[in-house]
Amino acid sequence: MTVASQVKQTLASLKGARGTLSMYTVQTRDDETQSVYTNSLEIADNIINDLEDRLKVLEFEEPQYKGN
């Protein structure tokens, strides 16, 4: 498995986890818990953005990985 495909797989997993966190954020009624979920969503978004940037670099360096 190439680095690019591992990054793509990690991104997909993280986006799924982010979706779950988002669902939990909407469903919870406790303010403190909602704050924790919101903070976790922000962290997940930052990581997703970092990985997407890294993937762009990988695809630029190795064009054969683009779109796979």
Predicted regions and their residues:
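Amphipathic alpha-helical coiled-coil segments
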Residues: 44-58
